[in-house]
C-alpha cells in the first residue's frame, strides 16, 4: 500500500476516536440546557386572559379547552 494512504487512514482513525470519546461530556451539558429550558418555561407560565375570564372558565369547567389551557395556564393548572 501507498505510505501516504496509510498515514491518512491512521490520522483519520485517531481523529474519529478522539471526537467520539469526547461526546459524553457534551451530552451532559445538553441535558442541563434542557433542564434550564424547562425551568424557564415554568417561570414564563402566566394567564394571558384577564383574571376574571380565567376564573369563570375554571368555574364552568372550560379548562379542558385548548384555548383556556394556553391562555389561562396558571388558573387552569397547566403549569
Swiss-Prot record:
Q: Which cysteines are joined by disulfide bonds?
A: 45-79, 54-72, 63-76
Q: Known post-translational modifications?
A: Two similar peptides (OspTx2a-p1 and -p2) are obtained after synthesis and oxidative folding. They may differ by a D-Cys at position 76 (corresponding to OspTx2a-p2). Since C-terminal Cys residues are prone to racemization during solid-phase peptide synthesis, and if the presence of a D-amino acid is correct, it is probable that OspTx2a-p1 (L-Cys-76 form) corresponds to the native peptide.
The lineage's top-level taxon is Eukaryota
Q: Which interval of the chain is the signal sequence?
A: 1-21
Q: Where is the ShKT domain?
A: 45-79
What is a single molecular function from GO for this protein?
toxin activity
The protein's UniProt keywords, in alphabetical order, are:
Cleavage on pair of basic residues, Disulfide bond, Ion channel impairing toxin, Neurotoxin, Potassium channel impairing toxin, Secreted, Signal, Toxin, Voltage-gated potassium channel impairing toxin
InterPro entries noted in UniProt: ShKT_dom (IPR003582)
**Main localization (coarse):** secreted
Question: Subcellular location, in the record's words?
Answer: Secreted
GO cellular component terms listed in the entry, alphabetical order = extracellular region; nematocyst
Recorded hits in PROSITE patterns, A to Z, give: SHKT
> Where do the segments described as Crucial for binding to potassium channels lie?
67-68
Q: From the UniProt record, list the residues forming the propeptide.
A: 22-43
Q: Which family does it belong to?
A: Belongs to the sea anemone type 1 potassium channel toxin family. Type 1b subfamily.
Entry function: Toxin that weakly blocks the two voltage-gated potassium channels on Kv1.2/KCNA2 (IC(50)=1.8-2.5 uM) and Kv1.6/KCNA6 (IC(50)=5.6-6.2 uM).
As a miscellaneous remark, the entry gives: The 49-Phe-Pro-50 bond exists only in the trans-isomerization. Negative results: has no effect on rKv1.1/KCNA1, hKv1.3/KCNA3, rKv1.4/KCNA4, rKv1.5/KCNA5, hKv2.1/KCNB1, rKv3.1/KCNC1, rKv4.2/KCND2, hKv10.1/EAG1/KCNH1, Kv11.1/HERG/KCNH2, and Shaker IR (tested at 10 uM).
| Protein's recorded name | U-actitoxin-Oulsp1
Organism the protein comes from? Oulactis sp.
Provide the organism lineage as a comma list: Eukaryota, Metazoa, Cnidaria, Anthozoa, Hexacorallia
Amino acid at each position: 500500500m501507498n505510505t501516504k494512504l496509510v498515514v491518512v487512514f491512521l490520522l483519520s482513525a485517531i481523529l474519529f476516536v478522539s471526537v467520539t470519546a469526547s461526546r459524553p461530556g457534551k451530552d451532559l451539558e445538553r441535558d442541563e440546557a434542557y433542564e434550564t429550558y424547562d425551568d424557564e418555561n415554568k417561570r414564563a407560565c402566566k394567564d394571558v386572559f384577564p383574571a376574571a375570564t380565567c376564573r369563570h372558565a375554571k368555574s364552568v369547567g372550560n379548562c379542558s379547552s385548548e384555548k383556556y389551557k394556553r391562555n389561562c395556564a396558571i388558573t387552569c393548572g397547566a403549569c
